[in-house]
């Protein structure tokens, strides 16, 4: 399968500014590639990472635009984006995985990551620790009265500082070596609906209308 890809010269930032990739980025756009022979998916290499403060997410730029073309039958293809397995080692995730790049999209391929730990929550807890600590100081309580409490406050503050550092650090580097996710291109077979007059025309099945866990857990049949 041959797919058209264009290495962009410029990319648009969240601020609306348009920057020159060659001048602004440390690495130039890199074509997706298979990591090993026989791999189903190609790895994607990011060239720039932005933090979207409003939505508390990281956006990775690839500097690539695609025309993913048609399948052998002339039907449109679709590109699926999937997280890499090493993402399970962190608290980050791709919120819309598997993501879909439709046949007609000609813009830059962007990858989004969020952290399961809200940055706002970390800030709130850290602020609470500071408030309690300041209250203790203003009340002029002796250390003998608040020894254990003070130690616990310090432990909480240290924990929150470490968590905030992790939350603020993007999951992948943009050094031309880190791979942020993977892609695969499939045929998006066209669907046409055949409406029937009664539910019986759908036919019978062992599961029937059992859903949301109702259809599992039964004894296996011999």
Predicted regions and their residues:
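DUTPase catalytic domain/fold
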Residues: 1-222
């Amino acid at each position: 399968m041959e797919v058209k890809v264009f290495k962009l010269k410029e990319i648009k930032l969240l601020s609306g500014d348009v920057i020159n990739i060659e001048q602004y980025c440390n690495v130039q756009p890199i074509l997706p590639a298979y990591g090993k022979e026989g791999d189903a998916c190609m790895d994607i290499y990011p060239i720039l990472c932005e933090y979207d403060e409003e939505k508390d997410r990281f956006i990775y730029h690839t500097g690539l635009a695609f025309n993913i073309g048609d399948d052998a039958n002339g039907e449109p293809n679709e590109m699926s984006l999937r997280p890499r397995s090493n993402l399970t080692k962190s608290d980050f995730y791709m919120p819309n995985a598997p993501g879909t790049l439709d046949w007609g999209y000609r813009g830059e391929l962007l990858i989004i990551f969020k952290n399961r730990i809200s940055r706002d929550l970390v800030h709130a807890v850290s602020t609470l620790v500071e408030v309690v600590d300041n209250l203790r100081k203003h009340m002029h309580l002796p250390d003998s009265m608040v020894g254990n409490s003070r130690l616990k406050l310090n432990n909480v503050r240290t924990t929150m500082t470490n968590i905030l550092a992790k939350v603020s650090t993007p999951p992948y580097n943009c050094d031309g070596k880190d791979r942020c996710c993977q892609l695969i291109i499939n045929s998006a077979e066209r669907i046409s609906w055949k409406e029937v007059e009664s539910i019986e025309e759908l036919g019978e099945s062992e599961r029937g209308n059992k859903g949301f866990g109702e259809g599992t857990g039964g004894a296996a049949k011999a």
